[in-house]
Amino acid sequence: MASSIKTVILFLLPLLLAYSVLAAPDITDGGDKPGPEIDDGGGDKPVPGNNDGASDYAKPAFEPEFMGAWVIDNPNAGVAAMQLQLMPNDQIVWFDTTSLGASGYKLPEGTPCPINPDANNQPDCYAHGIAYDWKTSKYRPLTLQGDAWCSSGNLWPNGNLMATGGTFSGDKAIRVIANDDPKGDFTTKIGALADTRWYSSNQVLPDGSSVVLGGRDSYSYEIVPPQMEFKPKRFDLPFMQQTTEPPLGPGRPVENNLYPFLFLLPDGNIFLFANNRAITFEPATGKTVKEFPVLPGGSRNYPPSGSAALFPLKLTADNAPVIPEIVICGGNQPNAYELVDARHVTEKQFLPALQDCNRIQPMAADAAWIPEQNMPSPRTMGDLIHLANGDMLMLNGAKKGTSGWEDATEANLTPVLYTPYKPMGQRFKELTPTTIARMYHSCSALLPDTRVLVAGSNMHQFYTFDTEFPTELRVEKFSPPYLDPALETERTQIDPANTDAVLKYGKPFKITAALMEKQPLVLGEVKVTLLYPPFTTHGFSQNQRMIVPAITSVQNGVITAVAPPSGQIAPPGYYIMFVSHLGIPGAGIWVHID
């Protein structure tokens, strides 16, 4: 009899739980108070193979109580991080404008001062870029030729960094720094690009070349191969002029569509979002494949500067179709910049930033914007980055205003953990705040040790320190919740000597790993993630991409997984590979995919 009762209870329990979820009020503010009913933001039933985080493990993942922690990694790195790229040699390259005077890093005595063509051809004895060793916190100066102010960039398949565009003499430049030379500097080719690229965005393609798209008064894109010498070719892109505000032609100072959001889709097309509209297009021809509904609520690109990310691409061993999903958060009203910019007004009015997020599956036949749960607070100029275990982190930015010199106020000091696979009302979790404002011209990057490095912030035309939001030269590191000291024994350790460092498309690869106390890992409790390190600037992490390969076996401390099937899923190049145990990742290692 007892056995029969137990069977009935086990049968009814899932139904009761399902009813309780359906009967619960929708929550839209990230807190505990019910909000008005809205669309369920992708729903509580994620699409299989997409962002179904609940299916990552065969048992519940750990829920750390740790709220994160901040440390100062370096009290003065000398150069504000306007643009930032983590390289496979474990140096982080960041750089600033060269045309607006001194940085905080004067070149050592005896070092030749290069002539700066964008500063009246005078000798410039200050560094405007550095290579920062995240393991030692030491850094060295880099030389920039042609102003890289508000430029874009990406890694080549060999790990070299290519930075594209900027302004003045650098508006068509490419700058390359080699990955295999730990003491290397930029090699620059002025005038290499087909169009001026100031506030443009890059996206790496399946063959390792990259789309360089948009920029001020540049309604076009071009494809740049991973080499210094090439013949530039320009593709007209009327969509970029159509999304400019006001749409009256060159020389307008509002735009609202600079630093457009670009994502390579699994079908090889590019998803392009600018201002409040989106299309997909064929990069080889420029042909528009699909137009999407207008995203209501405001403008999402520079200068309102929202954030966007592609959810992790989850693969199966049998190469089932991958369903990509994109989220866009924050920004501001279309007129927000005009109300704060000195070229328009004498008294600034800082509008509250947007607090909403919206999701879309662009390859779906009926693709439409679905409201996500609101963020806990408004945010403009924030970063939205992948964490090692597949969760996401929002940080940096402001609660009011836009990008631009002195055009924002109320720094948003509180990072937010974003877990899009959880039920509505549980997807955002506010973490330990920093004490350092990271607003305009700040950046962040996930490190191989699973922490997040944060640098930069300069709200001013020149380096300015005696003000409410001073130019920020301190470097911080943030430990996310998964670095809970109480869960140290649940962390994984990869054995690099017995792990495949080169992954071939569609082929199995092996990882030797164990828990910190050498306990064996178990199938169903392990997840592998592969992160393509992004080029981050102005709230958008260009080329950011996380792949979750299928695991086929875990035996005797060896994980066997299947590499991504093609460059359309994972463009060739270097990735950081992490292994997580029930949501708790260990330090990653660099691997190469081709």
From Swiss-Prot:
This is Putative aldehyde oxidase Art an 7. Coiled coil: none annotated. GO terms for molecular function: aldehyde oxidase activity. It is an enzyme of class 1 (oxidoreductase). Residues 1-23 form the signal peptide. It catalyses: an aldehyde + O2 + H2O = a carboxylate + H2O2 + H(+). It holds the Pfam family Glyoxal_oxid_N. Keywords: Allergen, Cytoplasm, Glycoprotein, Oxidoreductase, Signal. Expressed in pollen (at protein level). Its EC number is 1.2.3.1. The N-terminus is blocked. It is found in: Cytoplasm. Residues 28-56 are annotated as: Disordered. InterPro entries: Gal_Oxase/kelch_b-propeller, Gal_Oxidase_central_sf, Glyoxal_oxidase_N, GO-like_E_set, Ig-like_fold, Ig_E-set. Catalyzes the oxidation of aldehydes to the corresponding carboxylate by coupling the reaction to the reduction of dioxygen to hydrogen peroxide. Substrates include glyoxal and other aldehydes. Does not have enzymatic activity on D-galactose. It comes from Artemisia annua. Disulfide bonds: none annotated.
